[in-house]
């Protein structure tokens, strides 16, 4: 698979990225995410996306482990390491896994997990139509 994933403080290939099926983000949809795009060296509205992501984390009472500057660097490095001209970028902060089974479902004890990835951008309408525009009938 093409792209790169940042998790557990390291960059890995998408096929090597693993998460527990007991992660609250998976079980309860207890996760904050944002999606961005890049074309060439330009990452579309990066600062606005990071700000929105941070506000969502606060709303979910999740502690984002990275500053805005660190997140900018992580995203830029994901795009760079992907080697792609156009990318779909996703940021996720999950409530995480409760490390001790004796704690049951006490999500306050979960270990949060941040993940970022950059994978090939998919032109839903095709690249030309996306640039020139199209008609939508509702």
Residue ranges and their predicted role:
Residues 1-138:
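Conserved alpha/beta cores of soluble small-molecule-handling proteins
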């Amino acid at each position: 698979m093409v792209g790169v994933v940042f998790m557990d403080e390291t960059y890995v290939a998408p096929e090597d990225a693993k998460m527990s099926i007991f992660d609250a983000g998976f079980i309860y949809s207890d996760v904050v995410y944002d999606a961005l795009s890049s074309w060439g060296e330009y990452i579309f509205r990066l600062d606005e996306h990071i700000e929105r992501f941070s506000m969502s984390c606060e709303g979910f009472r999740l502690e984002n482990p990275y500053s805005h500057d660190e997140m900018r660097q992580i995203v830029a490095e994901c795009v760079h390491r992907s080697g792609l001209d156009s990318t779909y970028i996703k940021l996720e902060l999950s409530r995480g896994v409760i490390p001790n089974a004796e704690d049951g479902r006490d999500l306050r004890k979960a270990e949060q997990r941040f993940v970022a990835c950059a994978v090939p951008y998919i032109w839903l309408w095709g690249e030309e139509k996306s640039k020139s525009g199209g008609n939508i009938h509702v």
